[in-house]
Amino acid sequence: MAHCGAGGAAPVALLSSPGHGRKGLPRKGPGERRRLKAAVSEQLSRDVLRLLREEIHTDTILSVSGSLFKVHKAVLLARAPGFHSHIIEHTSSDLTNELVPVDGVEASEFKAFLQIVYSSNKNIKNYEEEIVKKLKVGSLMPEKGPDVSFPRYRTSSDCFLGKGEIPEDITGGGDCFISKADSDLEPASELGGDLLKLYLSQHYPDIDICVDGRSFRAHRAILSARSSYFAAMLSGCWAESSQECITLQGITHVEMNVMMHFIYGGTLDFPEKANVGQILNVADMYGLEGLREVAIYVLRRDYCNFFQKPVPRTWASILECLIIAHSVGVESLFADCMNCIISHFARFWSERSFANVPPEIQKTCLSMQIQSLNHGNAAFLLMESDRLIMGLPRVKWTEAALSMASQLQEECVTFIVENFSQIIESENFTLLLQSQAMSSTAHLLDKIFKAIEDNITAENSCSLLMALDTLLNSESTKEMGFTCRIQAVRGKLWAFLVQSFYAVRHTGSWKLMHLDDQQKIQVAALDKGDDRRLGRKPVLTSSQQRRQGSDVDVLKIKPWTENNKKPCQTSLSTNQKMRSDGLGASGHASSTNRNSINKVSKHGDSTKMSKVVKEMKTGGKYVSGKSKTMVKPQTENSDHTKIEGLSSTVVGRPSRVTAAGRKDPVHGKGVQNQEVETTGARPKVLTANLNVQARAKPLQTLRGKDSTCPASVGPSSRSTHSSTELLASMGSVDETKENGSVEDKCRDGKPYVSDSPGQMVSNGVMSTAAVKSRAVARITNGTASNKSFTHEQDSHGNSSVIKRGDGKGLSASAPQTAAKKRGSSNGCTAAQPRTKSAPPTLAQAQGSQGESPHSVKSSVSSRQSDENVTRLRHGTDKQIPKRKVVKQGHTTLQKVNAKLVPMPKIPSQPKKGGTVNSKDSKQKVLPGQIMLQSHASQRPSKPEVAEKSVLHGVSDSRNHVSKQRPHESPCTLACDTSGPEVSQIPCRPQPQSPLGSQEKKRLELACQDRSTLGDSVKRELRSELAGIEQSHTSAYKDSSQCNGNPNCGSIAALKSVISNPNENLINSNPVHNSDSANTEQAYLSDRERETGRENTDTEPSMSCINGKAFLCVPEGTSSTLNPTQSDRRLTFHGAAQSQLPDDCATEDSKCATVTSAVSSKCLLGQPSEKNCKNMEMSETPESHGTPEAPFVGPWDLNTGATHQRESPESDTGSATTSSDDIKPRSEDYDAGGSQDDEGSHDRGISKCSTALCHDFLGRSSSDTSTPEELKVHEGDLRTEVRVRKQGGGDHQIHSASDDEIPRKKPEPWSRSTIGYPREKGSTPRGSIPSAQEGDQVSSSADETEDERSEAENVGENSSPCSSGTQQVQGIINLAFDDGAEHESREFSATKKFRRSVLLSVDECEEVGSDEGEGHTPFQPSLDSLSPSDVFDGVSYEHHGRTGYSRFFKENEATTAEHNHNKGNGGYKNESFLLNSRSKDFEKQDKQCVSTDQKTRLDVPPKGSQQLFPENEEVISKREAAHSFQQHSTFMDGDTKSQERPCHLELHQRELSSNIPKISSVKSLDSCPSQGLPQEGQVKESRPTPPKGANNAVFSGDIDDCDTMAQTSMYDHRPSKTLSPIYEMSLTAACEQEVESETHVADRGSEDEQHFAKQDWTLLRQLLSEQDANLNITSSLPEDLSLAQYLINQTLLLARDSSKPQGSAHADTWNRWSELSSPLDDSATSATTASVSSTDCSPQGEWTILELETQH
């Protein structure tokens, strides 16, 4: 604090000789000193005069002419020694206030004299002499008097001068404080000088002040006059007033000396040793305002050199002065210092002493520096800050300065962008341009231009354009060579203006633009003023920021394709645009990604196709890839394209690709490019990038417009499928028209939810994806067969998942987007939740337009009929195929992401009901997407199931798909196909006008399939759609689907259905009535489809439609139970029913076709692949090829080779989905435990996303997991998949894509137990990937054992499951309701749905048992379903639990296997993944059937049951056939499909006795598989109360799954399996629980943006509450039950894994161990599970942490 040495010396010099001392000082110094001196002297004069007037502490009284004057001897002595001497001789020195007469002077004259003495700043010697003369003349005394008095006077004078005794005293006692420097201090005036002499001479002192042991003798009167502090102290109120000596604290003797000098003399300087800062404090303390001013003056002079141009030695001292001024509070000085620092900030900030400045002062420096920005200095400050950053060393003391400089630079850039037009005219900007021209890199200019691009808004775009024109025309710019840079920015601005013309033309700056520019923009404008499109119009960042939901997507799309913007804003009018856009603004990111992918794909399509073909040839690998694809349903289109292509290349990769594809829509460009790079593999980068984008934007959109963007994104994937067909159509006029219809429907849906824009985008994205897919398909015409097969299958799987997401639709859109980002499996689930909402919308849209239904169905049919369509569209699509494929890839990815997000949305969407549905339909390619949404509704759990299945239960997924397809074989196939394929295919059908109609129906079917979550709705839609489609395109579709798409459709549908069943189960639980109705009808439809492939199917479809309509009513009843969910479903049903008949008919025909296709597809993997190729070759170019292409294209486009890696990542996504599934299941701990699951740990996002609670999970994923996390998670899984792929075909497949494993597994089922419906469902799943045939065969066997166990368990748990189902049904409806949906879902789903199906294997095991128990009470309401339910639940539980333990170790594999194991005991060990998946899918199928049947039981149970068994058989047969075909490489997919051996085998393995139950209760099986797996799981884990079980299962399941997910996620990719499983049961349960939770969260979740946050918050709350209220049968049954249920299920699953598995389970375990050896022993997993279940209380009150630790 001491002033600098130079400053210290200066004062002395100045004091000694002001003139000399100021020699080096500028004129500013002397002027300030003069002013200070005048002020101080004036103050001193007033203070001393006050002594006289107030007669303070006087000691003498003078009597003049009768008047008395009280005076002070000391003052008189100091000022008038002669007068003092004259008076004193008459007084006694000992007396105080002695009266002294003064004669010879008038009173008035004497008074004036005294005033002069006390106040004059001048020498008063003349006045004194006059008075003394008068006194002498008037004296009566002789000369003696004068003589006598003179000596006294003289003595007095001498004494005053310090020559007598006093001087000795002074030297003796005054040396301590009187120094030479002190003597040099300059007094303010003569008065000050006289008083200072008095102080130094110490005459008449009357008080001693002790400081630091030193004594300062002073005068009370002067102290009191000068200091308010001393005046109060000595006034008589304090004890010091009567003391001779007082002691002062808190002050040093140096400071006291300075203060005394100022009090007496008003000195203007300080001694060298003085601490100026401390003296400032002393001045404040003692009330010496003058001293404060002196101190400030000294600081300015000695520290700051009066703020003249700083010199190096003053940098540090000014900073020190700044600190002093801040600490003492001298604002004026602080401001001066700050202004100086601002003027030279670069020099000050680079000072080392700047690091010592308090942080608050540093912040003030920065803020004031920013405030100082103006048009003139902004460019200069930018350059200075850059120099500072470049010049500072990277050491600790510069950290603060570097940080501040970086912030300042950002602020400068922001300011420059905001005031660009003014700043470019400043001189400093010219200097900036010059410096940048001379610099090696014009990084500052690039920063400015990038900021301009990122901050373009409608308001500033015109002014920016004019400013850039000004720059371009300036000579300096041309000379410096920045023309290209400026033109690039101007080009983007121009694109924005063209795309946002309608918004821009209303701004004030528009009128200022050049007329030529205005006219050009108006002519080129995409938007001529459609208000609806305007909402989605903004393409750039600013717009995105404004529009959190659709704008984000729009922005994403716009930069990539101006057309995207237009489709976003005018879905109806911009159908063609949507085709190119990938459905519009909300799909913008996806569309952009797809476009980018398309561009890449155009070059690499052939490569991709060949890769796909190669992979297809690979068989196992291809199967694996396809399995992943199933998991990947979220990224329907691009994922499909990629997955199909990728699946051929890398079995393990497709799943990752799926995950990546899911992410890709989010990432957009980056993903596309990546996808292109990784044609064969799922793009890992794509996943990361896309996921990041999707996550950021869709989630952003989600949060801002939760349903808009996410829905868009989610539906985008589906839409991409349907859009693929649509886009193909859009490529041509027909395509456009188709898209228009779909989009019109989307529009219709648009009003319902803010998601409509996003969904519309999704539609566009879907279309794009479809085109892309198609393009790829075309390219790979020859390989299309293989590729298409896988692609179709993948597409179907994805479609089913997407459908599930669509079910969630808009509500779940955002959360689903998050989930998608999290992982492919999550993407699947998310997509399906979206579908939930979408199906009603689709129904509405379809009702509005036949095309829409056709579109939906078309998506399914698209795969099949799309092959025909592909041919038709070949020309059309060929025009747009690559671009569309690219778009589709993006869209698909984004859509998948959105769909994952939508999963949570579905709960809220049920509330919105028709509205959400309408929006969903809007989001989706209306019919297809709506159908997808419908399916998604049912599939929110299904997507996870699908993902899980994909991971390890692809067979399961296919089994489920098969099962569902038996119900909704055409519809479900269409729907399932639509799930992944609807996105791709719907676009294709739409491109084809005729086919478009059918394909739309397929889309609807796909949507329905998706709405497997809302099975009632979905199945209703499917039946209707099947009917409609059949009526419209029954024969055509049948032939086309049967020929080309049936394989894809069947497999995809099976896949979807497989995922759907679980999802349906879960959703069925939360939305069980609706789902059940849908499922039943879907099963009916499937069965009918299988029975009557074309005409017969049409009739059954119609029956289904009727049944669905009937179901719709009961669903309404269910709706009563779960008003929101049911509402949504009912809305969907109502809307869909009109469409459903056609679609159902079509789908029935499709089912027949699909059944054939399933067989074909099963065979397609190998023999049926030829079939598929033949059919698909004709249709594959478009249909199959397109699905393939979309898969490959989107995936490859997005990531190229990386994509396939992402395929494993997709599996991880699946695992993530599992985690998400688990998450939703543990709704209560969604907030914190969303990432506890295997997938969650690796990719917490995916976990959450795929969680049962579509709304909750989707949001959770979005909120919790970042795209980076997702990437990491996916990357880990991807790595596993790759290793597995490379290491072992089956093992690789299992690891890479569990769905492939299930496919292989279903093969054995199909062979060994063709008679088992469930196994058949598994077979189609299993047979999807040909490469997996071997694994699938073994898996089938394992699955069969698991199925037997499941059958046994079903027998045990059938009544509880039914009971649980019933309870859950009410909750199920709530699942459709955002908030209500969560509540009911988490409660009902936990109990009614076999969350285990959707849960990861671990989760399923845990949840399955707990859920089983929980569901056991609830599922009895399923009545007829109970046997099947129990079977599904139990066997699923046993296997799932066993798988669960392993899953902990091999999260992914185990997850898949868990489901499969639950479904197939035997399959568990060797093909645990496959088994789990197969089982899972079987269960899913069963669960779907069960769900349908449950719904039917709720609504038309009888018909439903009957239909269900048939459907299930058909599905099982299909699955079996599919699996068998894949493994056996048979071409008679139809026969195999009918056989359904895998499914039956599953039951046999599980329990021979249960197999009959399953076949008879097949429809119930689907539901029970949902409810029972949970039930069984609960049962297996331990018999916990349903609610307790639910909670325990949820929390525990999450933990276990999480632990497993962590463990096995890396080695295995059960994550996807986990996701599908989770989706099947956990999604529904969690969805309902989430719905309960999200009831609260989703009440705010009307704002789709708040879904994730709310869900997480609710989950956290629930988790926290859950610990306290483990038995949540009261206030928060759903929420707390979720956590408790998860825990219970985890424990029960663990216990069940060890106990009830039996030989079949042991066998499964052994096989699983083989499969999961890299990860962990199945036995170890089982043991872990057992330990946790054993250790935990029956209530499953373990904390999630404990469970996690245990597992």
UniProtKB/Swiss-Prot annotation:
The GO biological-process annotations, alphabetized, read as:
synaptic vesicle budding from endosome; synaptic vesicle endocytosis
SUPFAM superfamilies linked: POZ domain
Q: Where is the composition biased (Polar residues)?
A: 566-577, 588-599, 714-726, 824-835, 931-940, 1064-1082, 1329-1341, 1355-1370, 1418-1427, 1553-1572
Main localization of the protein described in the UniProt heading: other
Q: Where is the BTB domain?
A: 58-126, 205-272
Q: What residue spans carry the Basic and acidic residues bias annotation?
A: 734-750, 864-880, 941-959, 1085-1096, 1268-1308
PROSITE patterns, A to Z: BTB
One Pfam family per UniProt: BTB
Places the protein is found? Cell projection, Axon; Presynapse; Cytoplasmic vesicle, Clathrin-coated vesicle; Nucleus
The signal peptide stretch is none
Tissues where the protein occurs: Neuron-specific protein. Primarily expressed in brain, with the highest levels in the cerebral cortex, hippocampus, and striatum (at protein level). Not detected in glial cells.
Keyword Translocase tagged: no
* Biased amino acid composition, Low complexity: 852-863, 1210-1219, 1716-1737
Which branch of life, at top level? Answer: Eukaryota
Fetch the SMART domains from UniProt: BTB
Cellular component GO terms, alphabetical: AP-2 adaptor complex; axon; extrinsic component of synaptic vesicle membrane; neuron projection terminus; nucleoplasm; nucleus
Q: Under what name is this protein listed? A: BTB/POZ domain-containing protein 8
Q: What is the lineage of its organism?
A: Eukaryota, Metazoa, Chordata, Craniata, Vertebrata
